[in-house]
Amino acid sequence: MVENVKELLKLHEGITHEVYLDNENSSIVPEEIVDEMLPYFNKKAYGNPTLTHKPGWEAFEVIMKCFGKVSQTLGAKNLEDITFTPGETEANNLAIMGACFAQKDIGKKIVISEIEPINVLQVAEMMEKFGFSMQKVPVNSEGFVDLEKLKEAVDSETALVCISAVNNEVGTVQPLKEAVDIVKAKNPKALFQTDASDAYGRIPFDVQKLGVDLATVSSYKILGPRGMGAMYLREGINLERILEGQIGTQKLWPGVENTPLIVGFTKASELAFQNFDANVAKMRALRDKLVDGIFKELDDLRWNGPKGDRRSPDNANISILRAEGEALTIELSLKGVYISSGSACSRRLLQPSHVLVAIGRRFSEAHGSILMKTTRHMTEEDIDYVLKVFPSAVNRIRGIVGSTGVD
């Protein structure tokens, strides 16, 4: 495997222009965020925030400020409502498992949308080992949750409902407030959790206005460092801790806090919301230019998900018929354009995206899907370069597919 990777990297030598559009699975951290983080590794606030000495007190002060700043961006009431975790996946594990264990005397039913992210879906499935049942709520062809089916699914045994604010693959902006109201009217004791990683920094999102009990977000999806996320827990809601160990500044996540990454995440959140409207407008304009250019140059394409304001401004998911998404990803990589074929979580299993299957895409359409996400740091020149190399890459892959008789 290592040798194969070395050979693949050699093929990329000589690339002069690179455009990173795989912002679903990672992101390039801007220099201003890196610069903000660096001193906290070895020059200041490098102590354990629970210890009684200067470096510890410095770390405590910094982390408390970060709690406050991130809580404000989410619309949380208190800084104590926020728990920093080593990523979105860990935050979802804490939210779902912690809520289920705390709610087990109320009920043992979990209701989720059928297009939840893999890290939500798998945790919910895992809870079946502890006696919980799971019911999936269907979506329509654009990925919107069927609210009538949601109402039918929630009953007196429902402990937790999980619906992402924005779908990570097709960008569907769910009517979250309406969904929360339906759940609470049917069962006031049921908790409502939302993975807001693809809403955070892209659409207006306020936990208090929405009425959610739990929300999770990711650092790298707002151009912060990987390995950092956060969970919001509404004041007055009980959650069981799922990991044991030394308790620092957070009662729900043990261990020594990672001050540099917390600082980086906080700086990323500040920048994402500092010029929110302008950032969103730029992401949308670049995305629209990219999509319009692709559809102008190529035929046999399928747009996956909704359009307009009902979709996340950065998200573009296209099924390219007579082409295989993974092959196109490699072909574009050789030209310095980096995208994702569907969901990275599904790709390693060589299975079509469960999201695309749920919205009615055929097997070939799902396997021919690609996912691209723009950021506020991209330029018009970046999109121009992508549009320059994209059609020839697709035509080359289609030629290979056609010659092999694969469809």
Feature annotation, model-predicted:
Residues 1-407:
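Pyridoxal 5′-phosphate
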